Amino acid sequence: MLHIKTIEGQLDAKGLKFAIVATRFNDFIVDRLIGGACDYLQRHGCDRENLTIVRIPGAFEMPLVAKKLAHSGKYDGIIALGAVIRGATPHFDFVSNEASKGLAQACLESGVPLGFGLLTTDNIEQAIERAGSKAGNKGAEAAAAVLETVRVMEQL
C-alpha cells in the first residue's frame, strides 16, 4: 500500500494564546459555553494567562471584534461564543446569517483560525442542551476545533 502523507493537528494548547469573543445577550447560556471552552483549553495545556475573554453586546458585533483580535497578532486562535434564539420575527435570520458570514470572512481575511461556537437555536431548550446538557458543550467543541486547526496550520 502506498504511503500517503497525513497532516493532523495535535491537541496540545501549551504556549498558545486564545481570545474568546462572547456575547452578553443570553449570558445564562453563553457563560456555560465560555466555561466549556476555557475548561477544554486548560485541560489541554493552555495557561489561564494565555486566555482573554472579550464580552460584547450581541452576535451582530462578533465579526468586527473577531477581525480586530485576529489582526492584532496577539492570538493564535479566536473562539466566537454566543446564542441567537429564534423569536417571533425575522430578526433571528438577519442576525445569525450576518454574524456567521462575518465570522467566516474575518477568519479567511486574517488567516487566524476561528472556532465557531455561535448557537442558533429555535428555542431556549435547544440552547441549554448545547451548552453542557444533552448535546454536549458547543463552547468546548469550538475550542477543540480551533486548537486542532491552529496546530494543522503550523504544519502547512
Curated annotation (Swiss-Prot):
It catalyses: (2S)-2-hydroxy-3-oxobutyl phosphate + 5-amino-6-(D-ribitylamino)uracil = 6,7-dimethyl-8-(1-D-ribityl)lumazine + phosphate + 2 H2O + H(+). The gene is ribH. Catalyzes the formation of 6,7-dimethyl-8-ribityllumazine by condensation of 5-amino-6-(D-ribitylamino)uracil with 3,4-dihydroxy-2-butanone 4-phosphate. This is the penultimate step in the biosynthesis of riboflavin. GO terms for cellular component: cytosol; riboflavin synthase complex. Transmembrane segments: none annotated. Keywords: Riboflavin biosynthesis, Transferase. 5-amino-6-(D-ribitylamino)uracil binds at residues 25, 59-61, 83-85, 116. Belongs to the DMRL synthase family. The active site is at residue 91. It comes from the Bacteria. PANTHER family: 6,7-DIMETHYL-8-RIBITYLLUMAZINE SYNTHASE, 6,7-DIMETHYL-8-RIBITYLLUMAZINE SYNTHASE DMRL SYNTHASE LUMAZINE SYNTHASE. (2S)-2-hydroxy-3-oxobutyl phosphate binds at residues 88-89, 130. Pathway: Cofactor biosynthesis; riboflavin biosynthesis; riboflavin from 2-hydroxy-3-oxobutyl phosphate and 5-amino-6-(D-ribitylamino)uracil: step 1/2. This is 6,7-dimethyl-8-ribityllumazine synthase. GO terms for biological process: riboflavin biosynthetic process. GO terms for molecular function: 6,7-dimethyl-8-ribityllumazine synthase activity. Its EC number is 2.5.1.78. NCBIfam families: lumazine-synth (TIGR00114), PRK00061.1-4 (NF000812).
